[in-house]
Design a protein with these regions (language model features):
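Non-catalytic, C-terminal membrane-associated alpha-helical segments of glycosyltransferases
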Residues: 232-311
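Short beta-strand-to-loop acidic/aromatic patch adjacent to the donor-nucleotide binding site
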Residues: 91-102
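Glycine-rich, basic loop-to-helix element that forms the pyrophosphate-binding segment
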Residues: 68-89
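A short, conserved alpha-helix in the catalytic core of glycosyltransferases
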Residues: 170, 175-177, 181-186, 191-218
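Short, well-formed alpha-helical segments that are part of the catalytic scaffolds
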Residues: 13-28
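Short beta-strand-to-loop element that shapes/binds the nucleotide-sugar donor at the catalytic cleft/hinge
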Residues: 126-141
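A conserved acidic beta->alpha catalytic loop
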Residues: 42-52
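A recurrent flexible, glycine/aromatic-enriched loop bordering the glycosyltransferase active site
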Residues: 156-177, 243-246
Length: 311
C-alpha cells in the first residue's frame, strides 16, 4: 500500500468539508507521510463557495475538484470521483470519505497494518472499514456490521475492540477498498440514488470471498445524522399522496434503493419488499408495529413524543 485515492463528494457543507480535509492532512503528517494521497472530490452543485475555499487552502497532497450536476446525490458524486481516480490510475486502493468526518491519527497506523494482516491471514487484500464515534459523547456511530435477520435486515454493529474483526458489510463513512477488489467488482452500482451502495458493495465483496475487516481503533469522529425513528412520526401525519411521494423520494424511504439492494444482495426479498413498501405507505402504523415486533422491539407506543429506534 503506497498510493491511495481519497474519494469524496460534497454539497453545501463548506465548513465541514474543510475540517474533514484538514483532519485528513494533520493525521497523515503526524503518522504516515510515506503514503501518497490524492484527493478526488466532486462539487455537486455547491452554492456556498466550497470549491473556492478548498482551492484557497494549502494542502501537501493534490486535490482534484470535479464538477457535478447538482443532482448526483452521494452515490453519483462518489462514482464521479471514483471514475476520475481510475482514469488517472496507479493507485493501490481507494478511500471512501464522507465530508462530515474528522479523521483521527490512529487511522493512519491501522490502515497499512490491515493490509499486512490481510495478506498474511487471507492471502489477498480486501476492504477495511473504519469505525466512527460521536465527538461529544464518544458513542459508536458508524462502522462494520453483520446481518442478524436477512428478512428485516436487522444488523448487529461491531464496535472496534483493539483487534481486527471480520464483518459482512459496512458503512462508507471512512472505508478503504483495495485495488484487487475493484478489479473484481468494479466501482459502485450506478443504479442507486443517494445512499445504500456502501452496504451493497461491502456485502457483495464479502459474498465474493474478499475479507471485509473492521479496523482495531476508531478511525474518525462523526455524528449520527439519522433520526432515531427514521422519520416515522412525520410520515404518519402525512396525507396518502405525500406518503407515496416520500416512499419514492431519494431523501425519504427510497423504495427504489430498497428494491435494488434486495435484487442484488438478497433476491428472494424482492417481492416482499415491493409489497411491504406500499403497505408502509397505505397502513403506516400497522406496518411499523409489525416491523418493530419482527426486529425484537417489545414495547411499542405511538405516542407522538416517543421515538422508536430501528437499530
Amino acid at each position: 500500500m503506497n498510493r491511495i485515492a481519497v474519494l469524496m463528494t460534497c454539497h453545501n457543507r463548506k465548513d465541514k468539508t474543510l475540517r474533514c480535509l484538514s483532519s485528513l492532512q494533520d493525521g497523515w503528517r503526524i503518522t504516515n507521510r510515506e503514503l501518497f494521497l490524492s484527493i478526488f472530490i466532486t462539487d455537486d452543485g455547491c452554492t456556498d463557495g466550497t470549491a473556492q475555499a478548498i482551492r484557497e487552502q494549502s494542502f501537501t497532497f493534490p486535490v482534484h475538484i470535479l464538477q457535478g450536476s447538482g443532482n448526483l446525490y452521494w452515490n453519483g458524486g462518489m462514482i464521479n470521483s471514483w471514475k476520475a481516480a481510475r482514469a488517472e490510475g496507479g493507485f493501490d486502493g481507494y478511500l471512501w470519505l464522507n465530508d462530515d468526518v474528522v479523521v483521527l491519527s490512529e487511522f493512519w497506523t491501522d490502515l497499512p497494518a490491515a493490509d499486512i494482516f490481510c495478506q498474511e491471514n487471507y492471502g489477498k487484500k480486501g476492504i477495511y472499514v473504519g469505525s466512527t464515534k460521536d465527538a461529544d459523547t464518544g458513542a459508536f456511530t458508524y462502522g462494520g456490521f453483520n446481518y442478524v435477520n436477512k428478512l428485516t435486515l436487522k444488523d448487529q454493529l461491531l464496535p472496534p475492540n483493539g483487534s481486527f474483526q471480520t464483518c459482512e458489510a459496512g458503512h462508507g463513512n471512512i472505508t478503504y477498498v483495495s485495488e484487487n477488489v475493484v478489479n473484481h467488482l468494479g466501482i459502485f452500482c450506478d443504479k442507486y440514488i443517494h445512499g445504500g451502495t456502501d452496504h451493497d458493495y461491502t456485502y457483495l465483496a464479502h459474498k465474493a470471498g474478499f475479507p471485509v475487516l473492521i479496523l482495531p481503533h476508531y478511525a474518525a469522529a462523526c455524528r449520527n445524522d439519522h433520526s432515531k425513528d427514521g422519520g416515522r412520526k412525520n410520515f404518519f401525519s402525512l396525507p396518502l399522496r405525500e406518503r407515496l411521494h416520500y416512499l419514492h423520494s431519494p431523501l425519504g424511504l427510497n423504495l427504489h434503493n430498497a428494491l435494488l439492494f434486495s435484487r442484488r444482495c438478497f433476491p428472494w426479498r424482492y417481492p416482499i419488499i415491493l409489497i411491504t413498501g406500499y403497505l408502509k405507505a397505505l397502513f403506516p402504523k400497522t406496518y411499523y408495529r409489525c416491523y418493530l415486533r419482527a426486529r425484537g422491539v417489545k414495547q411499542i407506543s405511538w405516542d407522538p413524543n416517543t421515538n422508536h429506534s430501528c437499530s
